A protein has these predicted regions:
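Compositionally biased terminal segments of proteins
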Residues: 1-177
């Protein structure tokens, strides 16, 4: 599941090109691995992407990133329980992922949208917006990230309202624990 700033580009295809979403994508693209324990097939993701010019980078926290001159690929998993600062090993994918809070909000009710000509799964726009509003104040000492999260949330909420889908935000909000 693609998450993060790249979703805004996908939401443009989901809502239609006339939606006034500004898409300032970052160089990194985040992939949420929703249910790591359910992965049945082993795929060595770093080896697969190595053929495309990606290099494995071991981040200071122990999780890996795949770096290309034009793109950085990161893998995230929902943090469970009390959480930990340690990476989550996903041997069936050949990666270590970073666990972050509240990502479980993004794994339910995903949509399919077109991103750079490829059909991908991404969080429902309502879940994306609520998640951004939830995490923005938690980005202590990073005011530019806080503002970016709030701006993205407002833009997506406006697109939902413009398409008569604001009730979906209420439904997502009501389903939150």
């Amino acid at each position: 599941v693609v998450i993060g700033s790249w979703c805004l580009e996908g939401y443009k295809s989901y809502f239609g090109r006339k939606t006034p979403l500004t898409t300032l994508r970052t160089r990194d693209i985040d992939f949420l691995v929703p249910r790591p324990t359910r992965i049945r097939t082993s795929v060595d993701v770093p080896a697969l992407l190595e053929d495309l010019g990606f290099v494995t980078d071991f981040h200071r926290g122990g999780y890996i990133r795949l770096i290309h001159p034009e793109l950085i690929v990161e893998f995230l998993v929902p943090e469970r329980g009390r959480g930990t600062d340690h990476p989550v090993r996903l041997p069936q994918l050949g990666i270590n992922a970073q666990a972050l809070r509240f990502l479980n909000m993004l794994e339910e009710g995903t949509i399919t949208a077109t991103l750079e000509g490829v059909r991908v799964r991404m969080p429902h726009p309502a879940a994306f917006a609520l998640h951004k509003l939830l995490i923005a104040p938690r980005r202590q000492g990073r005011p530019s990230k806080q503002a970016k999260d709030r701006d993205a949330a407002v833009a997506v909420l406006e697109a939902l309202r413009a398409h008569g889908a604001i009730e979906l935000v209420r439904e997502h909000l009501a389903s939150m624990p």
